[in-house]
C-alpha cells in the first residue's frame, strides 16, 4: 500500500510504502425476512394453525444454527448467554446465518404467544404469559433491527426489518389494548410493506400485498376503539371483522355498540304480524342478519359469501335455542293444538326457522354458482370461459339441486305456517323452479351417456316445470325468473337435437344389425357359391375357399352297461370235471429217483 506524506522540513511530498495487507471490501447481505418466515410458517404447522409445531421447529432451527456456526451458549453443564454482535457480520468470516438467530428467536417467542392465545379462551391466566412472550419477541426484534441498521445489509433488508419490528410491537400493543399506539405501529408496518412491494418485481409483489391486507382488520378495529364506537355506520365493518375471525368477543362488543339500536328493535313485523322480541341474543342476531345483505353486496367471491352466511347460520342456531329455552320455561307454550292461534314466541321461533332455512338455501345457491364456474354447458352459447378448477359434471349440479329441494321441503313444514296459503304457494313455486333445474341437469347427464330418448323426456319435463314456475307467484327473496327463461330457451333447441340423435341411433342400430349378420359369416366359398359377397379374406394368403380338414361332428357312442345281475347268479360247480391228483401220471423226476436209490422210501 502506498501512502503520501508531507515532509515538515522540506514541504515535499514523499511516498511511503507500507507492508500492511490491502483491506477487503466488507460483504453486504440481503435477507428477505418476510419471504423466509412465510415459507417456514407454511411448511411447519401454520398452514393448519399449529403454533406449537412451529415453535418446536424454531427451537430446533436455532440449535442447528448455533452448532453449524460454532457459536454455542456455554457447554453441557453451564449456560453462558452469547448474543449475536456486529463482529460476526463483518470481516472475512462474516456469515449471513448469524442474522437468522435473532429473527428465529423472535419467531419462536411470537409462536409461543399465539399458542397461549388459543389456550387462553379456557384459561384466562395464560394471558399474562402471552404478554410476556410478546415482550420477549419485541426484544429480539429490536436486536435484529440494531444489527440490520449497520452497513452490512442493503436497503431492502433494512426496510423489511423496520416493518417486521413495527408489526411485532403493534401485535403486543393490540393485546395490551393500547389502541392508539397499536394502530400507529401497524400502520407504519403496512405503509412500509406497501411501498416495498411496489419497488419489487411483479412476481414478488403478491406476498407483500397479502401481508398488507392482513393489517386492515386490526387497523379498523383499533380505529373503532379509538373513536369510542359511537359511529353507527361501522356496524357492517364490525360484522366483516367477525367474518375474518379477528374478534373473539363479538357478542360483548355488539352488545355495547348496538345498545341504542337494540332498544328500538323490540318488535318485528313479518307477514302482516308483529311479534315482541324479548331474548337479548335474538335481538343481536336480528341486527346482524339485517346487515348481512350489505356485506354480501360488497363481496364478489363466492367463498367469502359462503363463509359470511355460515357464520350467520351459527348465530341463528344459538338464537333458536334461546327461544326454545324460553318456550320450555312456560308450560302454556309447550304444546300447540290444531286450529289454535300461534303465540308470539312460537311465531318468533317460526320466523327464526324461516331465516335459517332461507339462508341455508342462499348458501346452497352460492355453492351452485361456484360450481358453475367450472362447468361447461353445451346448450348455452353465451358461456365464455370455464375456470381452471376441477371439472364439474352435470350430475354434481343435479345433486346440489336435490339438496336444495330437500331444504325447500323443510321450509314448507315450518310449524305455524302450515295454514298460510300465500307462503305455501310461494314455497311450492320455489320447489317447482328447482325441479326444473334438476331435470335439466339430469338430462345433460343422460346426454353424456348417449341415452337420447330419456334425455328428451327429461327436457320436456324440465320445460313444463319452468313454464309452470314462470306463471306462478315467485318468492320476493329468490328472483330466479331470468335463469328460468334461459333454461326454457336452451331446452327449445337442445330437445329437438336430442330427438334427432335418438332417431339416428335407431337407424344406425338397424343397419349395423344387418351388416354384422352378413359380415360375421364364416362359411367357406364352396358352400356359398350362389351368394355374392365381397369377401376381402379371399385375397389374403390364407383364403377361405375350402376346408380340407372336416369339422368334428358328434356321433353316438357305445352305451355303458352295468351288469349288476351277475352278482346274484349262482354258477354250477365244475369240481367233478377236474382231474384228481392221484390219477396224474408219474413224472420223469420220480423215475430218476427210484432208479438211483434215493427218494424211494418204500424199500426200507
Swiss-Prot record:
Top-rank taxon, per record: Eukaryota
Coiled coil: none
Primary location class: cytoplasm
Residue segments, region Disordered: 1-21
Example of a GO MF term: 7S RNA binding
Compartment(s): Cytoplasm; Nucleus, Nucleolus; Endoplasmic reticulum
Transmembrane region(s): none
Pfam families for the chain: SRP68
GO biological process, one term: SRP-dependent cotranslational protein targeting to membrane
GO cellular component term of the entry, any: nucleolus
Stretches with biased composition (Polar residues): 1-12
Key words, A-Z: Cytoplasm, Endoplasmic reticulum, Nucleus, Ribonucleoprotein, RNA-binding, Signal recognition particle
Keyword Iron-sulfur: no
Function: Component of the signal recognition particle (SRP) complex, a ribonucleoprotein complex that mediates the cotranslational targeting of secretory and membrane proteins to the endoplasmic reticulum (ER). The SRP complex interacts with the signal sequence in nascent secretory and membrane proteins and directs them to the membrane of the ER. The SRP complex targets the ribosome-nascent chain complex to the SRP receptor (SR), which is anchored in the ER, where SR compaction and GTPase rearrangement drive cotranslational protein translocation into the ER.
Subunit and interaction comment: Heterodimer with Srp72. Srp68/Srp72 heterodimer formation is stabilized by the presence of 7SL RNA. Component of a signal recognition particle (SRP) complex that consists of a 7SL RNA molecule of 300 nucleotides and six protein subunits: Srp72, Srp68, Srp54, Srp19, Srp14 and Srp9.
Similarity annotation: Belongs to the SRP68 family.
Protein name: Signal recognition particle subunit SRP68
Biological source species: Drosophila melanogaster (Fruit fly)
Annotated gene: Srp68
